[in-house]
A protein has these predicted regions:
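Active-site-proximal loop/turn and secondary-structure-junction residues that shape catalytic pockets
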Residues: 12-14, 37-39, 77-79, 107-110, ...
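Active-site acidic/histidine proton-transfer and metal-coordination neighborhood
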Residues: 20, 62-69, 77-162, 171, ...
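Conserved beta-strand positions in the central sheet of alpha/beta enzyme cores
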Residues: 34, 72, 103, 133, ...
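Glycine-rich, proline-tolerant flexible connector loops at the mouths of alpha/beta enzymes
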Residues: 34-58
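Surface-exposed, active-site-proximal loop segments in enzymatic domains
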Residues: 41-50, 76-91, 204-211, 215, ...
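Residue-level preference for long, well-ordered alpha-helices that form the structural scaffold
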Residues: 48, 52-55, 83, 110, ...
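Alpha-helix-loop-beta-strand connector modules within alpha/beta enzyme cores
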Residues: 50-71, 123-127, 222-229
């Protein structure tokens, strides 16, 4: 059995409120969760954790009662009109919950401006003990591992990291040999799932799969063993595996979370 941190990502059980998510994570056998303080899209179902003080208290109580820890918070986007100072409330709340990692997306075509904002965010996050992780995604302005590395180099901050998500790594055609060259301190956690079938030509279909139709580890076609061997040993894993089909079939959040964990543990036994 691995002693690696395994965290339940919000997207896996997005229908749950943060306190419910903590409870499901504890029942399913996780050690950590990830919390969304900002929705990924305007359409998604979202609980206003950042503004709802009662919800914050309920979440803190569940964390205390279950012993579950918070690994990361998400998702902040670097856009052309971003004011980095506006992100401080997210950092303060994340630190209050004990999070050490922050998920950041690059949604600005001006690489220098985006890198400057990433540098400012790293400076803002440092007193909170939080490490911003730039997550590359094929449909964003930071579409692959190489692009993320360019932004980190331009930002020039030692607490700036890259978040490798198995789905995006596969669909962006990023390369394991490039991952091997990254300093391990730039890879403080990763997101795990599996992916079925070849890369679609349609970016809208890639986006749909990313948000609705991932696979549990071992149920798809990714070289997850190779990916995990390229990452730092025992790097914490956030299990981000949305499965809309199972949700529509009535499979509970607990059952989906448990399946994700069991499949991941089976995969890790192969490493």
């Amino acid at each position: 059995m691995t002693h690696r941190i395994l965290s339940l990502a919000a997207l896996t059980v997005l229908e749950l409120s943060p306190p419910e998510m903590v409870e499901v994570a504890a029942r399913a056998g996780y050690s950590h969760v990830g919390l969304r303080t900002e929705p990924a899209t305007v359409e998604e179902h979202h609980y206003p954790l950042l503004r709802d003080k009662a919800l914050q208290r309920q979440t803190a109580a569940r964390l205390r009662d279950t012993g579950i820890k918070v690994l990361d918070i998400e998702i902040l986007r670097l856009k052309p009109l971003t004011r980095v100072a506006d992100f401080e409330a997210h950092l303060a709340l994340g630190a209050e919950f004990g999070a050490s990692e922050l998920l950041v997306a690059g949604n600005d075509p001006d690489v220098q401006r985006a890198s400057d904002n990433l540098a400012q965010l790293c400076d803002l996050a440092r007193p909170y003990g939080i490490h911003p992780h730039l997550e590359f995604m094929p449909w964003t302005d930071c579409p692959d591992l190489a692009s993320a590395r360019v932004m980190l180099d331009k930002a020039g901050r030692d607490n700036a990291c890259i978040l490798v998500d198995a789905f995006h790594f596969d669909r962006s055609k990023s390369r394991l040999e490039d991952l091997h060259t990254l300093p391990p301190q730039r890879l403080r956690y990763a997101q795990l799932c599996d992916v079925a079938g070849p890369r679609p030509d349609d970016m809208a279909e890639i986006l749909r799969q990313a948000r609705q139709e991932r696979r549990f580890p071992g149920d798809g076609d990714c070289d997850l063993v190779g990916l995990l061997r390229a990452l730092p040993e025992d790097v914490p894993l956030s299990l981000e595996i949305p499965t809309a089909r199972l949700l529509e079939q009535g499979v509970s959040a607990y059952e989906r979370a448990r399946m994700a964990l069991e499949k991941t543990q089976a995969l890790l036994a192969e490493i």
